[in-house]
Amino acid sequence: MIPQLCALAALPLTAILLASCGTDDGPMLAGNTQAASAEGEALYQKAKQADESGKTGRAIKLYGETATRFPFAPSADEARFRQAQLLEQDGRIEDAFEAYDQFLARYPGSSQYLTVLNRQASMAQSAAEGDVKSSFLGLKTKLSLEKTVAMLEKVASHAPRSRTASKAQFTIGELYQAKRNKTKEAIAAFRKLVAEQPDSPEAPEALFRVGLIYMEEAERGNQNQANLDLA
């Protein structure tokens, strides 16, 4: 046994390393990475051609495939960005929001990060404004309350303790406040804003909203008691 161990120890380090790379579980070699990048760029060019030809559906598919299969390709971030834009233009709001979200999660160092974040925030705020107006008018909304809140939470998570996050958190409180049966959630949302960003421009109004909700709840309680007394 000892002679065998000695013989193994005498093998050159390069031979051992080469042997260890013989399985499929090893890291991707530089040549493979370059080949994948080249393939990704070729796919991106096909997506651009479809885009320029007005074949929106095909362009969306190819842009998404480029960014998903070849995330390290030079144009992968641009592919995801353009996919999101086309989805938004096509009216597929939830899909567009998700594509923007994938961009923000994958390419935080991109020069277009702030542009994408602002676009995503605008989409979430627009969805929320429609939800609030519909709640007061008694209409049904296209997106559920849960989905709209989730959109705003994602926006806030990409820019914690920023003005964008403050606006998003305040809007979450407004959404819940517009629902008569969501007062606890509204209070919690407004309080979270005040606790995490007490110096934000939205904090004073959030604190005021908490007091207002408590007053409205007390008035409703008194009215209910009065109705019981009259019964």
Annotate each PLM feature.
Residues M1-A9:
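Bacterial N-terminal signal peptides that target proteins for export
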Residues L8-L17:
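Bacterial N-terminal signal peptides
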Residues L18-A231:
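Acidic, polar-rich low-complexity tracts and alpha-helical solenoid repeat scaffolds
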